[in-house]
Amino acid sequence: MKFLCPVCGSNTGLHDSYDRHVHIDENIEWIVIQRVICTGCGKTHAVLPDFIKPYKHYCAADVEFTLRDIEDGAATEQANTVASTSTVKRWVREFKNRGFQAVGALRALLHNVFDENINEIKLTGLKIFGALEHVLDAFPTIESNSLAIGDANIWLTHHMAGIYV
């Protein structure tokens, strides 16, 4: 698989790997994360599978399903997850901060890379997941777990360094 540097767009090569744990339901699984190094700028990047969010220990599906429940009106304390209430509250705060930022970044990416535009009016009144899904529908189909957060992070981390949901 070929990865381009999200900072400068140059080719990358294998650099290193590390072990990382991820909570999948009530289980803790250890996986190997590959790192690549840019041949242009020398920066290194972790190549995360789409079922892991950057800097998070819970699988993306657990995070997304929990956030969807809360966005649909469920109380934080009643979220269907093994994560603690304080962790869920942190997810909600971060999602509110990053969600619409990601929508804007994806719209810019869609315009710059694919010469496609999404009118702001089409996003008016949508909740964060609705806006993410509307924008993601305009992108080419990719092989993924089909979660909005995972798909958004694939596009963002491959084209824009430092931006993720």
Where are these regions (language model features)?
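Basic, short loop/linker segments at the boundary and entry of helix-turn-helix/winged-helix-like folds
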Residues: D16-F65
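Long C-terminal interaction/binding lobes of large macromolecular proteins
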Residues: K43, Q101-V165
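Short, charged amphipathic recognition helices of the HTH superfamily
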Residues: I70-T85
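Short secondary-structure capping/junction motifs at helix and strand boundaries
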Residues: A75-Q78, G99-V103
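Major-groove recognition helix of helix-turn-helix-like DNA-binding domains
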Residues: V82-Q101
